[in-house]
Design a protein with these regions (language model features):
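Dynamic "connector" segments at or just before major functional cores
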Residues: 1-222, 228-241, 424-458
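An anionic, glycine-rich sequence signature occurring as long contiguous blocks
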Residues: 4, 24-40, 270-371, 452-458
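Short amphipathic alpha-helical "interface-anchor" segments enriched in bulky aromatics
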Residues: 57, 346-389, 393-400
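Acidic/histidine-rich, metal-coordinating catalytic segments
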Residues: 174, 244-256
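A short acidic (Asp/Glu
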Residues: 182, 257-262, 282-286
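Short, surface-exposed basic-aromatic patches at helix termini and helix-loop junctions that form
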Residues: 261-270
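C-terminal, non-catalytic "cap/extension" segments appended to globular domains
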Residues: 378, 383-386, 390, 397-458
């Protein structure tokens, strides 16, 4: 029977979409106020929209573009789908966001935020993991070294004003272990660490936190291996750019190398380097040890004292200052020695040396926050290039946070991800612009608005 009622018609082409929408709905019953229904029809959503100010900062100073200029692209231009610059940006910003594995590219290549960060048209997928892996195996040793030099250029450009105002550059030198678990080239067993590993060499600038150099070395390399050639490459640029600026260097006893002392003295660098105890040093401090032992027996309180003396080893061409710290407690006597050409009281020299603990914090952030130990390629050069990418990601964030409000200038990467980078947003493209609808309940909106001005060139 015809009732005269005619319901709304559904276009045939929409029936399949409607059925899929109904089938893909998820129901949750724990909420006592209403039924919860969820589906995957929200459109282009990202959880990393907070990286946009960092990308604007990068664009303003030409950082990724400058790095890409040092990397040759051997591919035929007519067959290139993903330019080298886009691959570089994709890989670097994934590292910054906490997606350190190349395999993560397969999950993120459709993410609208990363498409914007890589300057890729929205909706056009980014490169896959195999493409990134082939690209990582492309650079030569010369290109990697030149790219590291490009990072030094960026340091001079972005931090030069601070260096000239402070009139001091403080270099913290250290090495770190990078455990390996596969068949990586030049990965060897290191008895000191009791593991198969690489042994990277790192040089930080203390006042700015910048990583001026990171060199990958074979697993059996000593702590001080290649330190003088690496310092020479850095210092030639620093001395040329910052004449009259005092340069200081700190390192632990693994760098107690006479050639390094001579190098620093030749270039006028003030060095403070740990040096192992020996029979001569113990004999020169024997009276101090006995005096501290007597004080401890009288007071039963831990005792500490400092002294210094001049010493010339057989292989040294001159006398050098040795600073000693002696401690006596219930566990006995503890002796520490430094070799230095710095003036000042012995206690002040040791206090200056002990502040190099900040370098350990930087290394921890570099390895754990930026996952710089993910060097799982087979070829040594590919892993050296990966270390370069992680170094650049670290420095990009570090240069960025030097311009942040004072409360965040010392924040580590995990804090920056929580308070700035990890913001949920819906991305919508119109004929005129791309609109990013950030989460309305984001608790750091005012901070984000301030930070967003860092890359504003209007």
């Amino acid at each position: 029977m015809n009732t005269g009622f005619r319901g709304p018609s559904i276009p045939f082409r929409s029936i399949h979409r409607l059925i899929q929408s109904v089938l893909s709905q998820l129901n949750f019953s724990f909420y006592r106020h209403q039924i919860i229904r969820a589906d995957f029809s929200g459109g282009q959503i990202t959880g990393d929209a907070g990286l946009l100010p960092l990308r604007a900062f990068d664009q303003r100073h030409g950082l990724t573009r400058e790095l890409a200029q040092h990397l040759r692209d051997p591919r035929r231009s007519g067959r290139v789908r993903h330019a080298s610059l886009a691959l570089l940006r994709q890989r670097v910003y994934q590292i910054v966001a906490g997606y350190e594995d190349a395999n993560d590219a397969d999950r993120l290549r459709h993410d609208p935020a990363f498409q914007l960060l890589a300057d890729q048209p929205l909706g056009q997928p980014l490169s896959s993991q195999p493409t990134l892996s082939r690209w990582e195996n492309t650079p030569s040793a010369r290109e990697i070294v030149c790219a590291h030099d490009g990072g030094l250029d960026a340091f001079v450009r972005l931090c030069g004003k601070q260096v000239r105002q402070r009139r001091e550059i403080l270099l913290d030198v250290d090495s770190t272990d990078d455990p390996t678990y596969g068949q990586q080239q030049l990965s060897f067993f290191n008895g000191a660490y009791n593991q198969h590993m690489y042994h990277p060499l790192l040089i930080f600038e203390r006042h700015t936190g910048c990583l001026l150099a990171a060199r990958l070395r074979r697993g059996t390399a000593s702590s001080h291996a290649r330190i003088v050639p690496l310092l020479l490459r850095i210092l030639r640029r620093l001395l040329r750019e910052f004449p009259g600026v005092t340069i200081r260097l700190r390192a632990d006893a693994g760098f107690a190398l006479p050639l390094l002392y001579k190098f620093c003295e030749f270039f006028g660098i003030y060095y403070t380097i740990g040096i192992p105890a020996n029979v001569v040093f113990r004999r020169r401090t024997a009276a101090l040890q006995r005096r501290l032992a007597r004080r401890y027996r009288r007071s039963h309180l831990p005792q500490r004292s400092f002294t210094s003396f001049r010493h010339r080893a057989r292989t040294w061409p001159r006398l050098r200052r040795i600073v000693a710290k002696a401690e006596h407690s219930a566990t006995g006597t503890n002796l520490r020695f430094l070799v230095t050409n710095c003036p000042g009281r012995s206690a002040q020299v040791f206090h200056f040396y002990n502040e190099r603990g900040e370098c350990e914090n930087r290394i921890e952030e570099f390895k754990n926050g930026f996952h710089a130990d993910r060097l799982s390629c087979h070829r040594f050069l590919a892993n050296a290039f990966r270390l370069l990418l992680h170094t650049f990601a670290y420095n990009l964030v570090n240069w960025f946070r030097l311009h942040l409000p004072s409360a965040l200038r010392s924040a580590q990467i995990e804090t920056l991800r929580t308070q700035l980078f990890k913001i949920g947003a819906r991305v919508r493209q119109t004929a005129r612009c791309v609109r990013i609808h950030l989460a309305s309940g984001w608790p750091f909106q005012s901070l984000f608005q301030i930070v967003a001005q860092l890359g504003d060139t209007s």
